[in-house]
């Protein structure tokens, strides 16, 4: 990818939307001070789907067209519905370890079901789930996972739900948005095996999906990871083909 295209895509990733004039005034590349040259690059990136035109001379970054629409297993449905019946006013979400697989380079057999519950109710939820399941863990850290958990054996993991987490509803259940999922994989200690070089690859593969970067960055800010998440996101798009 040429340095000029890298410059434009990085600029687009940093801004929710931008005009041709914005780019022209901000440009650190002397070639882009000529509007005809700049327009040719904007047209090229728009035709390739790397930018989208949303108005006269206004652009947003264009990511993949795939939507994050994971299949929810019967066990996840049963446990979520059980908890929701016990705690109808408590915010919660459910997801599965196998949803991570499409993003990974080194595949891991994670068959866990994760239930995130409001902090004040999460320990109560843990004890309630233990009435149904024997293989249940409450907020396990790296040491506990390495010593006691076999993720391939379908454990249930109860965690605290971060306030104002971006969630969506699917088949009557609340699940994480992909934006939340990506940030949590970086921040949560129980996802230690996804961090480092593997996480960069996960973010690289996430460019195939439709991502609301404003939503992702707001949530990353709540988790005190904004600058690191932004840097990895911007670096990973440069090599995405």
Describe each model-derived feature in a short phrase:
Residues 1-14:
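Positively charged, polyanion-binding regions of nucleic-acid-associated proteins
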């Amino acid at each position: 990818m040429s340095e000029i295209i890298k410059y434009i895509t990085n600029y687009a990733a940093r801004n929710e939307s931008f005009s041709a004039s914005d780019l022209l005034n901000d440009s650190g590349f002397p070639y882009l001070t000529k509007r005809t040259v700049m327009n040719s690059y904007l047209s090229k990136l728009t035709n390739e789907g790397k930018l989208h035109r949303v108005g006269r001379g206004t652009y947003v970054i264009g990511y993949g067209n795939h939507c994050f629409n994971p299949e929810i297993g019967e066990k996840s449905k049963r446990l979520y519905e059980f908890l929701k019946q016990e705690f109808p006013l408590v915010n919660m979400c459910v997801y599965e370890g196998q949803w991570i697989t499409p993003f990974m380079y080194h595949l891991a057999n994670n068959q866990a079901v994760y239930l995130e519950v409001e902090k004040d109710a999460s320990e109560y939820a843990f004890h309630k789930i233990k009435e149904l399941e024997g293989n249940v863990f409450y907020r396990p850290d790296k040491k506990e996972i390495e010593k006691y958990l076999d993720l391939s054996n379908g454990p249930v993991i109860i965690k605290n739900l971060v306030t104002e987490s971006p969630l969506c509803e699917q088949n009557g259940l609340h699940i994480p948005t992909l934006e939340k999922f990506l940030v949590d994989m970086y921040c949560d200690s129980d996802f230690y095996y996804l961090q480092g070089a593997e996480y960069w690859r996960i973010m690289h593969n996430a460019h195939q999906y439709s991502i609301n970067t404003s939503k992702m960055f707001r949530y990353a800010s709540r988790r005190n990871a904004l600058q690191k998440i932004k840097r990895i996101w911007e670096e990973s798009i440069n090599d995405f083909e």
